[in-house]
């Protein structure tokens, strides 16, 4: 038995899970929230439903990593740190340099830092944690698991933009996608549930959370995805606009007398469901107020509309569909949302079982027995995918 630590680091949070492998048992999990502030919160769940929480100053990433390893020992989750035989790190941007997860060496770490211009909010922090854990756990393999590597199989006609090709050749201006680790996990898990090889299925996976993306999977690999050069592209999201005419971006920046970075910030932080509803980016708030607020109902309709358009285009791209998979917050818990989406996909043979659909975040098949397309709920588990990659590569 081996213990693998999965790290999902952001600028102000450090999420973690410790797995016993190869049984894939979660030994402990938790997070450090509000990093960089005087009231940072460390939480852990472990053992027989034991919980631990403390508030203290965690002002640097070094302090966060040290605190995590210290608490793992003090809480008796591990007796010695040398029980940890591998650490896996989520890294958002792998560009074209990384087509698979990788055991990190100094050259690879430099490349992750070089790719920071493609994921400026994530790569620098995630690369720094790799460096920190390498120092704190000497000799323990550090594996980077890239959000983008699942999309290394896209064909040029699906990842290139219709712009002068020198911009792609010089600057890497192309679709990279995001949420790849989530889509990869749910695609493989859905195939296991159906007891049908992924390689023989035409599958569409819907990651519908505050950030939302759709991926088409054929012959066992991704063939297209809704997010683009950045996670701003694709369907309407909680606060992100999704696809938008580039000329409108310049037009609004001029009208508002703001800079382009300020305009992009509006598209990332103040648009999507929040922008349309003028109330909330949370699907639950919109569903609760849809009967009394036309803007809430409109936001929900636009979201469903964008999802259906992408699914329809991917069905055409693959010349059919066998399996539709819902995951992430709204995808796992939104029975009404799933019903609204599937109702508009009836032309493809999608039919839900109403009773099976009325569950929250439980892994199951929810399509009717006579549905031509299998529809599933598969709660995502990026950390487990990370742990599996560590075991495969270390």
Question: Where are the predicted features?
Answer:
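Adenine-nucleotide phosphate-binding core of ATP-dependent small-molecule kinases
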Residues: 265, 272-276, 283-317
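Glycine-rich phosphate-binding loop of actin/hexokinase-like ATP-binding domains
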Residues: 152-253
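Short beta-strand-loop/turn "lid" adjacent to the catalytic site in phosphate-handling enzymes
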Residues: 72-121, 143, 149-158
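Glycine-rich beta-strand-to-loop/alpha-helix junction loops that act as flexible
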Residues: 9-10, 89-93, 208, 325-333
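Internal helix-turn-beta structural module
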Residues: 297, 301-317, 321-322, 331-394
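Short glycine-rich, Thr/Ser-proximal phosphate-binding strand/loop in the N-terminal lobe
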Residues: 4, 13-58, 228
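Phosphate/pyrophosphate-binding loops at sites that engage ATP/ADP/AMP, CoA/4′-phosphopantetheine
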Residues: 71-85, 190-197, 311-322
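Catalytic phosphate/nucleotide-handling subdomain of diverse soluble enzymes
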Residues: 218, 224-256, 265, 328-359
């Amino acid at each position: 038995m081996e213990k693998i630590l999965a790290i999902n680091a952001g600028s102000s949070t450090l999420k973690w899970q410790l797995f016993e492998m190869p049984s894939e048992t979660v030994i402990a999990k938790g997070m450090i929230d509000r990093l960089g502030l005087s009231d940072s919160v460390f939480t852990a769940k472990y053992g027989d439903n034991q919980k631990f929480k403390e508030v203290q100053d965690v002002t640097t990433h070094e302090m966060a990593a040290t605190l995590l390893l210290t608490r793992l020992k003090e809480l008796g989750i591990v007796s010695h740190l040398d029980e940890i035989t591998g650490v896996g790190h989520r890294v958002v941007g792998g560009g074209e340099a990384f087509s698979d997860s990788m055991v990190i060496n100094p050259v690879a770490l430099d490349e992750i830092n070089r790719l920071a211009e493609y994921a400026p909010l994530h790569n620098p922090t995630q690369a720094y944690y790799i460096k920190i854990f390498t120092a704190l756990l000497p000799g323990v393999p550090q594996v980077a698991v890239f959000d983008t590597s699942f999309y290394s199989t896209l064909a040029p006609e699906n990842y290139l933009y219709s712009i002068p090709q020198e911009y792609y050749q010089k600057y890497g201006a192309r679709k990279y996608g995001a949420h790849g680790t989530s889509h990869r996990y749910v695609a493989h898990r859905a195939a296991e549930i159906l007891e049908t090889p992924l390689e023989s299925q035409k599958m569409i996976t819907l990651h519908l959370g505050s950030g939302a993306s759709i991926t088409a999977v054929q012959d066992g690999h991704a063939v297209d995805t809704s997010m683009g050069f950045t996670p701003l592209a694709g369907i309407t999201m909680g606060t992100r606009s999704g696809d938008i005419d580039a000329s409108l971006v310049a037009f609004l920046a001029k009208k508002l007398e703001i800079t382009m970075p300020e305009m992009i910030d509006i598209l990332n932080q103040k648009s999507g469901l929040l922008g349309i509803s003028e109330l909330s980016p949370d699907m639950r708030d919109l569903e609760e107020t849809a009967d009394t607020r036309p803007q809430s109902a409109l936001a929900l309709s636009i979201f469903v509309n964008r999802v259906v358009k992408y699914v329809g285009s991917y069905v055409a791209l693959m010349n059919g569909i066998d399996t539709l998979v819902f995951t992430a917050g709204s995808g796992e818990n939104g029975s009404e949302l799933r019903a609204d989406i599937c109702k508009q996909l009836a032309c493809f043979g999608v039919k839900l079982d109403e009773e099976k659909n009325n569950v929250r975040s439980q892994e199951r098949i929810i399509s009717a027995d006579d549905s031509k397309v299998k529809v599933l709920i598969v709660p995502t588990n990026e950390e487990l995918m990370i742990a599996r990659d560590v075991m495969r590569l270390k």
